[in-house]
C-alpha cells in the first residue's frame, strides 16, 4: 500500500490510534500534527511555548507553523504517508493541495472518523492530558465542527471522502477503515 491519506475527525475519534496502526501495517509515514506540536511544547522551544498557550485555550495553532512541519517531513519522503490532524479547515486544505502539487505527491483519500460528542468528551477526559478538561474539550469540539464542515464538503465534492463511524473495538474500526480504503 503506497497510499497518501488524510485522517480527519474530531479530537478523541481515534485518528491517532488508527493512523499508527495503518502506518505500521503498511509502511506509511505517519504525521500527527498533535504529536509534533506536543513534542515542541515538551522541548520548551519558542514555538512550543506559543503552541502551548494556544492549545490551553482550546484554540488551533497557526496554519503556517503546521504547514512548515508537514513540508519538512514530506519533501524528504517518497513513499506512502498519512496526515493525522491536518488540514482542519478549507484554507489549510487549499494550502496543502498547493504543497502536494509542488511535491508531486497528490492526495488519494480522506478518511473521516465520526463519533458523537458525549463519547468524545469521555474518551478525551480518560486520556488525562493537562490541556483536556470538559470545558476546553467542548470548546475544541465546537471549533472543530465550525471549521471542518467546509473541509468535509470540499473533499466530498472531489470524491475523496470515506466515512467511518469509530465506535466499537480498535480492531472493528480498523476493519471498517480497510474496507473503506479498498
UniProtKB/Swiss-Prot annotation:
Tell me which GO cellular component terms the UniProt record holds. cytoplasm
EC numbers on record = 2.7.4.3
Q: Which residues form a coiled coil?
A: none
In this chain, AMP is annotated as bound at: 33, 38, 59-61, 85-88, 92, 129, 140
Query: Which keywords does this Swiss-Prot/TrEMBL entry list?
Result: ATP-binding, Cytoplasm, Kinase, Nucleotide biosynthesis, Nucleotide-binding, Transferase
The record, for InterPro entries, names:
Adenylat/UMP-CMP_kin, Adenylat_kinase_CS, P-loop_NTPase
Q: Where is this region: LID?
A: 126-132
Which GO terms fall under molecular function for this chain's record? adenylate kinase activity; ATP binding
GO biological process: what's one of them? AMP salvage
Listed as disulfide-bonded, the cysteine pairs are none
Summarize where ATP binds, as residue positions: 12-17, 127, 168
Catalytic activity reported: AMP + ATP = 2 ADP
Q: Where in the cell is it found?
A: Cytoplasm
Q: What family is this? A: Belongs to the adenylate kinase family.
What does the domain comment read? Consists of three domains, a large central CORE domain and two small peripheral domains, NMPbind and LID, which undergo movements during catalysis. The LID domain closes over the site of phosphoryl transfer upon ATP binding. Assembling and dissambling the active center during each catalytic cycle provides an effective means to prevent ATP hydrolysis.
Name this polypeptide is given: Adenylate kinase
Give the gene that encodes this protein.
Answer: adk
Amino acid at each position: 500500500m503506497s497510499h497518501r491519506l488524510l485522517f480527519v475527525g474530531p479530537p478523541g475519534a481515534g485518528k491517532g490510534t488508527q493512523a499508527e496502526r495503518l502506518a505500521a501495517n503498511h509502511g506509511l509515514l505517519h504525521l500527527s500534527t498533535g504529536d509534533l506540536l506536543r513534542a515542541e511544547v515538551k522541548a520548551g522551544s519558542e514555538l512550543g511555548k506559543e503552541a502551548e498557550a494556544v492549545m490551553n485555550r482550546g484554540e488551533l495553532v497557526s496554519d503556517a507553523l503546521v504547514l512548515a512541519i508537514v513540508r519538512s517531513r514530506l519533501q524528504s519522503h517518497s513513499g506512502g504517508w498519512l496526515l493525522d490532524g491536518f488540514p482542519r479547515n478549507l484554507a489549510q486544505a487549499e494550502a496543502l493541495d498547493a504543497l502536494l502539487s509542488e511535491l508531486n505527491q497528490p492526495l488519494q483519500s480522506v478518511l473521516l472518523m465520526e463519533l458523537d460528542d458525549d463519547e468524545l468528551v469521555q474518551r478525551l477526559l480518560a486520556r488525562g492530558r493537562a490541556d483536556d478538561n470538559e470545558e476546553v474539550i467542548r470548546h475544541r469540539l465546537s471549533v472543530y465542527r465550525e471549521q471542518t464542515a467546509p473541509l468535509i464538503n470540499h473533499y466530498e465534492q472531489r470524491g475523496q471522502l470515506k466515512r467511518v463511524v469509530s465506535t466499537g473495538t480498535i480492531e472493528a474500526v480498523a476493519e471498517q477503515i480497510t474496507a473503506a480504503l479498498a
